[in-house]
Curated annotation (Swiss-Prot):
This protein's record includes keyword Heme: no
EC annotation from Swiss-Prot or TrEMBL: 5.1.3.22
Keyword tags: Isomerase
Enzyme class, spelled out: isomerase
Family: Belongs to the L-ribulose-5-phosphate 3-epimerase family.
Matching HAMAP family: UlaE
Recorded catalytic activity of this chain's protein: L-ribulose 5-phosphate = L-xylulose 5-phosphate
Function (record text): Catalyzes the isomerization of L-xylulose-5-phosphate to L-ribulose-5-phosphate. Is involved in the anaerobic L-ascorbate utilization.
Annotated gene: ulaE
GO molecular function: intramolecular oxidoreductase activity, interconverting aldoses and ketoses; L-ribulose-5-phosphate 3-epimerase activity
Pathway: Cofactor degradation; L-ascorbate degradation; D-xylulose 5-phosphate from L-ascorbate: step 3/4
Induction per the UniProt record: Induced by L-ascorbate. Repressed by UlaR.
Name recorded for this polypeptide: L-ribulose-5-phosphate 3-epimerase UlaE
Length: 284
């Protein structure tokens, strides 16, 4: 019987670095998490996962079965380096190939949701042409995802093109495809001049998961919980009252900390306390 508890997960980059997924999932289980979100970022090391052999993919599946800790989502931030909106055809082609490989990887290992980075370009100057190419790239990507039955979900970003749920909904309406949805980050959403609660309500019906982190205006990473501007209790209340029942993912970058597990436990307890105040069922 499926649990009615709220699924609470941890980002891979919060845990000690390394390629042994059995160890990582065992640690996540010990720390009380239901799932781990995989990162495929712009580094060669993590990008190489998309070229894993059949045996390496099977090892991940076996680790999931052995531990009972799922890997249901992938944070695909590699498109910073290979953006779908690039005016360099070769770079854009690499971006689309990364998307194809990520979707195939997800299909092979049971990942259900690929979180997309909402950058038309990241290291270059954006313009109308980069935005057009980005839209076309998303359209092509969603067609691939549809065939594989893998959901692509847009993150609310630290970047003006996709810094609100309202803007991301524009792409959802443009693509008009059930395999394209939203994966908001309440930290990023709160760091901009957004009516956060109204934005969350607007996204209901399209939100497939929620990133949980603290931020300050202009500071989108490594803000300790409780030291930023995010009103977690109100965000959790709004999502609960709006009928959202999906997973929450604590996003941290403590993999290089002296004691990553201790940092994660501290964050986990802080977040769960805010969830309890919001009247949500505590995650295990």
């Amino acid at each position: 019987m499926l649990s009615k508890q709220i699924p609470l997960g941890i980002y891979e980059k919060a845990l000690p670095a390394g390629e042994c997924w059995l160890e990582r999932l065992r640690l996540a289980k010990t720390l009380g998490f239901d799932f781990v979100e995989m990162s495929v970022d712009e580094t060669d090391e993590r990008l190489s996962r998309l070229d894993w052999s059949r045996e390496q993919r099977l090892a991940l599946v076996n680790a999931i079965v052995e531990t009972g800790v799922r890997v249901p989502s992938m944070c695909l931030s590699a498109h910073r380096r290979f953006p779908l909106g690039s005016e360099d055809d070769a770079v854009r082609a690499q971006g689309l190939e990364i998307m194809r490989k990520a979707i195939q990887f997800a299909q092979d290992v049971g990942i259900r949701v690929i979180q997309l980075a909402g950058y038309d370009v990241y290291y270059q100057e954006a313009n109308n042409e980069t935005r057009r190419r980005f839209r076309d790239g998303l359209k092509e990507s969603v067609e691939m995802a549809s065939r594989a039955q893998v959901t692509l979900a847009m993150e609310i970003m630290d970047y003006p093109l996709m810094n609100s749920i309202s803007k991301a909904l524009g792409y959802a309406h443009y693509l008009n495809n059930p395999w394209f949805q939203l994966y908001p980050d309440i930290g990023n959403l709160s760091a901009w001049d957004n009516d956060v609660q109204m934005e969350l309500q607007a996204g209901i019906g399209h939100i497939v998961a929620v990133h949980v982190k603290d931020t300050k205006p202009g500071v989108f990473k490594n803000v300790p919980f409780g030291e930023g501007v995010v009103d977690f209790e109100r965000c959790f209340e709004t999502l609960k009252q709006s009928g959202y029942c999906g997973p929450y993912l604590i996003e941290m970058w403590s993999e290089t900390a002296e004691d990553p597990a201790a940092e994660v436990v501290k964050a986990r307890d802080w977040v769960k306390a805010r969830m309890a105040k919001a009247g949500m069922v505590e995650a295990a």
